[in-house]
Design a protein with these regions (language model features):
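Core subunits and conserved enzymes of cellular information-processing
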Residues: 1-260
Length: 261
């Protein structure tokens, strides 16, 4: 364990703020981290052969990734490291006291170390499995290195937002990926077979051409998206009140509201 602690001390990371960070600075760092993440999703990795990743669209939204770019790995290494370490600690295979400062610090450090490992492991898996194909065989190592570096940058961005920004970087990246996908599918004016790809432009196109069947097909996804959004907002506001009673104060009780979801 001493060897692990020695490794954790030399791990690179984002420095903790020494004082409370003002809200405007937290907002600035959150926006900066999100902007860098979105830009990474627009930078293709060098040496990869062109391919179509439509079958992997669901994975992209779940992992907050953009396959074929520096953001190919997304939050995958962070989530994988967290799940494995929580299972090991929760099952008692690794006996760390997470109630102590030392135990929590060791947990966070080892989680980061595992995330570094999974950046290279998942990058190699993407390339060696054929999901990302290099243009030439000798470019495979270069492709793996680029994907791993992209995953490490996302790891630091998550740490930056968690310490200096607002909320969690992982949640923000997932929300950004889902929001971007919804926005593009709703409002894209890119034409496919002389027809807009986005549902809203397609609806306008159908109404102007008098094609009611096409208008109905475009309207259903729009209404479904709005309905799901309203249901999520409503469900997020549902609270369950738990009655509490105190043995030391007979006759005194209160209700404790908890979020249902």
């Amino acid at each position: 364990m001493m060897n692990i602690d020695g490794i954790l001390k030399v791990l690179p990371g984002v420095k903790e703020p020494k004082a409370a960070v003002p809200f405007n600075k937290r907002l600035m760092w959150t926006f900066t981290g999100l902007l860098i993440f979105l830009l990474m999703g627009q930078i293709p990795v060098a040496g990869t052969a062109p391919a179509i990743f439509e079958r992997l669209q669901a994975i992209q939204m779940i992992l907050g990734s953009k396959i074929g770019t520096l953001a190919t790995l997304g939050i995958g290494p962070i989530v994988m490291a967290s799940i494995i370490l929580q299972l090991l600690v929760g099952s008692g295979i690794i006996s760390w006291d997470l109630n102590s400062w030392e135990g929590r610090a060791r947990f966070i450090g080892v989680q980061k170390l595992l995330a570094f490992f999974f950046c290279f492991f998942e990058a190699a898996a993407w390339v060696l499995s054929g999901a990302l194909t290099p243009k030439l065989p000798h470019l495979a190592l270069l492709l793996i290195f680029q994907l791993a570096i992209g995953g490490i940058i996302i790891l630091f961005l998550d740490e930056l937002i968690s310490k200096w920004g607002i909320g969690s970087g992982v949640s923000l990246f997932i929300a950004a990926g889902v929001s971007q996908a919804i926005f593009i599918r709703l409002f894209s004016w890119y034409s496919i077979n002389q027809m807009p790809a986005g549902e809203v432009p397609r609806l306008l196109f159908a109404l102007t051409t008098g094609n009611l069947q096409l208008a109905a097909q475009a309207l259903i996804p729009i209404l479904s998206t709005i309905l799901v959004f309203l249901l999520v907002v409503y469900a997020n506001g549902i609270k369950v009140e738990i009655p509490l009673a105190f043995a030391s104060f007979k006759g005194f009780g209160r209700r404790w509201p908890l979020n249902f979801f």
